[in-house]
Amino acid sequence: MQKMRILLIALCLGTLCGQVSYGGAGDRILLLGDSMMASNRGSGQSVAAVIEAAVGQDVSDRSVAGARYFYNLPITGKLGLRLTEQYQKGQWNWVVLNGGGNDLLFGCGCSKCAKMLDRLVSKDGLRGAIPSFIANIRKTGAKVIYVGYLRNPGVQSPIKACKPAGDELDRRLTRMARGDAGITFLPMSDLVPSGDRTFHQSDLIHPSVKGSRGIGARIAHVIKK
């Protein structure tokens, strides 16, 4: 059993979790999320790197590819596959995050997702795993930027069917943000032009370097305002 635990931890650290950056004393921006945030980290061209370059502040990037809100395995969950476990206490000015897409993809196959959507965030934006997590972050005084997902460029891909659920998630997150001036919902639904594959990697799921640049630039614009 102990060997299995060690193997799982090594697997997570080596493949699933990627490089987790722990913030130093001067860090004031914390980034959480799934593969949309974690992509291109190995080449130093992730969303966090784009934000750092644009605003001139270090970003503590704790995003983990595959992260979900509803994830039951205890060890890998603690290592960040449970999205809420990525949060690290600190004197953060900003907490930037995304999430919910893997819950829709793996929890309900991006179809018949009414119950999963309600678990993530209610129609009025007041209840659910996401508003609860954000409320706890806001209690620390940090401002929150919740980032929406890139959309499929209009071609066949494994996540093309996720658009209706993704659109509804965006609507609910917009309502959530309206209730608190310290929360910004930042959609990415209009970032990818129709037919343009260059914002995605070859799998048409994860952002390319160009996609990460576009996401990071929008986030940096909000921070610099």
What does each model-found stretch correspond to?
Residues 18, 23-25:
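Boundary at the C-terminal end of the N-terminal hydrophobic targeting segment
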Residues 26-31, 36-128:
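Conserved SGNH/GDSL esterase-like catalytic core that processes O-acyl groups on lipids
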